[in-house]
Amino acid sequence: MHMIQRVSSIGLRTLRSSNIGSIRSLIVLPILSIKPTYIRQTQAQINLKPQALLLNLLLHHHHHHHHYYSTKTAPPPPPPPQPPQDKNAKGKKILNRINRAFTFSLSTLLVVGAAGISVLVVSLILSELFLPSGDTRTFNKAVKLIEKNEQAQKALNFQSGQRLKAYGIVSADKWVRNRPVQSVKTKRKDGKDHLIMKFQVESDNGKYGVVSLEQIDNSMWNTEFEYISLDVPGFKRIYIIEPPKNQLIPKIGGGSGFLGLNWGPKKD
């Protein structure tokens, strides 16, 4: 009895053969079973030594028991399940559009309104400062005419070229100085706007007088004074610009009338 050593994955195992001299005899493998295709050997394999032949068979058997797998051709994973459909999705979509349209309209309205208010404020400021019909321009023109009048210089005791202080009518409290100038604009029968204004002027030596004037707005860019009068305590009324004949002009009195003036016919 001869012994044949075989190499396998679990170590060396001893196999027995009844006739080692004959290659064609049956080889008993207690662990591995050899397929019939391994027994059919070519003439070249028969001429090999028994040990080499057995090793060749075992290696061939071990090679064919390895399987290789690849994911290259594997099918794609199934798609995720679809979320359940909302029955109110269409209504929510319409409501969302309405909400967005309302928000856009409200924002646009606010922007347009703010822009309109800004334009109005700017136009009022510009007209007040630069247009001839503005109160500020009228006030400044009247003060300059009074400063150039000789009768006003004598009554207020100031020299030519000196500036006068001009401000709103002072109340009983002499500490109050920066009161706004009183003015009102009305439309008369001639269809033109008439601006009536009253303010106070004061020289550096403390002498003061009350100015009353009326201005006619022929147009936005063309104005003219109807009259300008100056009342200084202890002096007769001084007309910087003479009013038309029999023109009703306000007279300084007890202050019971509009703008603190008493209205009545002109007196010489």
Swiss-Prot record:
Membrane topology: Single-pass membrane protein
Mitochondrial intermembrane side: 127-268
Subcellular location field: Mitochondrion inner membrane
Domain of life: Eukaryota
Gene3D superfamilies according to UniProt: Mitochondrial import inner membrane translocase subunit Tim21
Gene Ontology BP, a term: protein import into mitochondrial matrix
Pfam families: TIM21
Keyword terms of this UniProt record: Membrane, Mitochondrion, Mitochondrion inner membrane, Protein transport, Transit peptide, Translocation, Transmembrane, Transmembrane helix, Transport
GO cellular component, one term: TIM23 mitochondrial import inner membrane translocase complex
Family per record: Belongs to the TIM21 family.
Subunit structure: Component of the TIM23 complex, at least composed of TIM23, TIM17, TIM50 and TIM21.
PANTHER family according to UniProt: MITOCHONDRIAL IMPORT INNER MEMBRANE TRANSLOCASE SUBUNIT TIM21
Record-given protein name: Mitochondrial import inner membrane translocase subunit TIM21
Annotated source species: Candida albicans (strain SC5314 / ATCC MYA-2876) (Yeast)
Taxonomic placement: Eukaryota, Fungi, Dikarya, Ascomycota, Saccharomycotina
Encoding gene (name): TIM21
